[in-house]
């Protein structure tokens, strides 16, 4: 994670919106989505970056199943800090150029406007759009408070309460 200090204020628009950071005790519930500007050409061939921001709704895969799938390809176990997902649409996934991009979760299904950052793109297959292996993301919920308090500073307010 990084904090970027901007020279001027950002004007929020339909295309520029903040994302909420999760609580450390976030429950894994609510729809997930990924966005990115990465390669839109599935399979091989010359990469073609997106002309417009791409959106894909995804489903979470339980970590033990994801670990079993990836264990056949790599000789490392996934960590509890990983989240695995599969695309809802066959042949669609994150791809080269999407690394570090957001995985967001909608915690308020009554509103399409309350999204929290759940993770960042970490790994996938070389064959974009491959549905045989889940996509891998790094969770951020366990790191957010530590990072905010120890890297940014100790004078941040606590999360607002629900009351």
Label each residue range with its predicted role.
Residues 1, 7, 13-88, 147:
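Chymotrypsin/trypsin-fold serine protease catalytic domain
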Residues 49-60, 103-163:
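C-terminal subregion of chymotrypsin/trypsin-like serine protease catalytic domains
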Residues 93, 99-102:
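Beta-propeller and closely related beta-sheet repeat lectin domains
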């Amino acid at each position: 994670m990084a904090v970027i200090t901007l020279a001027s204020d950002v004007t929020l628009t339909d295309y520029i919106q903040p994302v909420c950071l999760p609580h450390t005790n976030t429950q894994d519930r609510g729809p997930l989505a990924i966005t990115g500007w990465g390669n839109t050409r599935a399979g091989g061939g010359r990469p073609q970056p997106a002309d417009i921001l791409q959106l894909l709704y995804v489903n979470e895969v339980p970590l033990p199943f994801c670990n079993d799938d990836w264990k056949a390809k790599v000789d490392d176990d996934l960590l509890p800090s990983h989240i695995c997902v599969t695309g809802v649409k066959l042949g669609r996934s994150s791809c080269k150029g999407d690394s570090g991009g957001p995985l967001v979760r909608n915690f308020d299904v009554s509103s399409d406007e309350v999204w929290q950052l759940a993770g960042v793109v970490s790994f996938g297959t070389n064959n974009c759009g491959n549905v045989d292996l889940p996509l891998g993301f790094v969770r951020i919920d366990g790191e957010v408070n530590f990072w905010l308090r120890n890297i940014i500073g100790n004078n941040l307010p606590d999360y607002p309460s629900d009351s």
